[in-house]
Amino acid sequence: DCFICKSEGFEAQTQIVVSLNGTAIIATLNIVHSNILQACEASLSESAWERLGAKIGDEISLSHLDPVLSLAYVRAKIYGKALTSYQFDSIIQDVVAGKYSNIQLSSFITACGHNHLSTQEIVHLTQAMIKTGEQLHWNHPIVVDKHSVGGIPGNRTTPIVVAIVAAAGLIIPKTSSRAITSPAGTADTIETMTSVSFTAKQIQSIVAREGGCMAWGGALGLSPADDILIRVERVLDLDPEGQMIASVLSKKAAIGATHVLIDIPVGPTAKIRSDFEFLKLQDYFTVVGRELGLHVYTLKTDGSQPLGRGIGPSLEAKDILAVLRCENDAPIDLKNKALSLAAIMLEFGEKAPLGRGLSLATQLLNDGTALKKFMRICEAQGGFKEPSSAALTCDILAM
């Protein structure tokens, strides 16, 4: 309620430029009406404080943000216009620069949703997202990766697959996301057993040591625009098809993968609910991947019911360990799917002849080699810990 804010037309949720000693950031303005701040005083969030290197009593300057010209392209998309590569570059650069408010981000996400992006637009969006982030390079002709479109509870195959594939000698720098529309993302589950937040340099060190990793992609800056968009998508409970493809493939290209397996569960309550939707998504992934220089393989899997027994990070982690430890009561559906995915990757990664991938994957799991590799990767990532159990439990017996 400062008179300066009023005279300048600053309102709540306005995007403004905050400057201190030659450093400037874009911040969202919140206005308080209590006496916690005096006239001509402002407080900063912890992240803004750190980025500016501010100290108590410093004098900051506030100014209006220049007009965000790329918003004109978002408005064009809302009205059904096709966007060019340059226009997507402009939008994504402004998103990463913090020039978009949450409302404006929501409008962009919505404008691109419900099949509003052509294949070429998805290519442009993906390339724009890659340009704004860091890219890793590996001195190997084949670098494999996988992604599950998700949409079904459980389905936590990634740690098992990474362990098997890395144990076979392939390079698999696996990054995963946190939950968007489910109780747990792969990164959330792995975090109950080991650390997942690393810099790009640390990832390179871990992979050089063990051939694979299991990290949270959001800490790497591989596709910073995607991390910003996912934060808003989570609130909206949306995962638009075009942006999902751009999200997945931008991070696969940025991590340095050459061969990527896309697991697409199809079922009545999954994200993909019909063969028609599967074939359309398969075509999108293949065509966009080819434009990026990626060998993309898609696999239709059963999405009619949950996979594994546990739902939530800790319980899903217990399922993973049961499979890796070859326990008698390990969930057979999770085990079989992980083996089938690993088998395909071993074959296109040229570690097994066509049709022999499953036998090699099964051998590596059953003889304990995969478990040893999993533990070694965890140690390289800061050490392994058993996933904890909840303080309170309740047995619910089947009738």
Q: How would you label these PLM feature ranges?
A:
Residues 66-153, 373-381:
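Acidic, glycine/proline-rich low-complexity segments that act as flexible tails and inter-domain linkers
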Residues 142-166, 170-182:
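Glycine/serine-rich anion-binding loops at beta->alpha junctions
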Residues 1-79:
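Long, compositionally biased stretches
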Residues 189-213, 283-289, 293:
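A glycine-rich helix N-cap at a beta->alpha junction
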Residues 80-85, 95, 239, 258-399:
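Well-ordered secondary-structure scaffolds
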Residues 159-171, 251-256, 291-292, 348:
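Alpha-helix C-terminal capping segments
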Residues 109-113, 146-147, 186-189, 224-234, ...:
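Active-site-proximal beta-alpha loop/turn segments in soluble metabolic enzymes
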Residues 208-259:
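Phosphate/diphosphate-binding glycine-rich loops and adjacent basic-rich segments that engage nucleotide
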